[in-house]
Amino acid sequence: MAENKEEDVKLGANKFRETQPLGTAAQTDKDYKEPPPAPLFEPGELSSWSFYRAGIAEFMATFLFLYITILTVMGLKRSDSLCSSVGIQGVAWAFGGMIFALVYCTAGISGGHINPAVTFGLFLARKLSLTRAVFYMVMQCLGAICGAGVVKGFMVGPYQRLGGGANVVNPGYTKGDGLGAEIIGTFVLVYTVFSATDAKRNARDSHVPILAPLPIGFAVFLVHLATIPITGTGINPARSLGAAIIYNDEHAWNDHWIFWVGPMIGAALAAIYHQIIIRAMPFHRS
């Protein structure tokens, strides 16, 4: 009888491998199918309420983003010294924290883009249709204009005197410096978005979708810490456009192209790097 029990224990112990593979090798049993690319045009979207609901979510998120962040910037510039205000770190936390909160709130509705550069990068990767991408960008820009407009309504005089939170290339830097900072900063952000929302990672690790807003917000925080002294940190064309339109100063408009060209190039490079180098999508066999 004892021998039979010992044999049962041995059989039970040998049912499983002594060591489990780490990383992606441990997930080979899970069936993963690459989602099909989004169509370039999807006319059916225009008759769907979820399409317009997503656009409204992007508008509201970008509105709140500009409202909180531009108010924070105004508070910093209004202070007599950095010690009596939130400082650059506080401004960076305001931008990163709002992205964290707003991506968390809107990810299940619109994907939580809140940024035309993010939308552009995801469009290049065929994650959404051209119809949806254009609609998102328009709603993001409108939300940003309204958000900055509300801030100006609260402080009309100080808003113009303190620069309106508009992005410009700061003294001591060239336009090339500003463009480079915007390209690299947006690359960091959009690459983080791709990595944090990767469908293959989501299939392997169930916690990834819940945690996605955290690295995205943290990336925004770090980029602001690095590039506020150079350009005030754009990396979001809607944010730059909203502040520029409401501030409406010649200096802001002279530099404004940098805050569209730079982020779009950075987003395109991030999409190419993630899709071709990291995921090797062109080499996948159907």
UniProtKB/Swiss-Prot annotation:
Conditions for induction: By water stress.
Q: Which tissues show it?
A: Roots, ripening fruit and senescing leaves.
Q: Which residues form a coiled coil?
A: none
Which residue ranges are assigned to the Cytoplasmic compartment in the record's topology?
1-55, 111-133, 197-209, 279-286
Name any Gene Ontology BP term: response to water deprivation
Pfam families from the xrefs?
Answer: MIP
Q: Which GO terms describe its molecular function?
A: water channel activity
The keyword DNA-binding is annotated on this UniProt entry: no
Annotated spans, Disordered: 1-35
| Keyword Cell membrane among UniProt keywords | yes
Instruction: Motif NPA 2: list the residue ranges.
Output: 236-238
Any one cellular component term from GO for this entry? plasma membrane
Subcellular localization: Cell membrane
Bilayer topology term? Multi-pass membrane protein
Q: Which InterPro entries match?
A: Aquaporin-like (IPR023271), Aquaporin_transptr (IPR034294), MIP (IPR000425), MIP_CS (IPR022357)
Q: What is known of its domains?
A: Aquaporins contain two tandem repeats each containing three membrane-spanning domains and a pore-forming loop with the signature motif Asn-Pro-Ala (NPA).
Function in brief:
Aquaporins facilitate the transport of water and small neutral solutes across cell membranes.
User: What does the sequence similarity comment in the record state about its family?
Assistant: Belongs to the MIP/aquaporin (TC 1.A.8) family. PIP (TC 1.A.8.11) subfamily.
The protein depicted here goes by the name Probable aquaporin PIP-type pTOM75
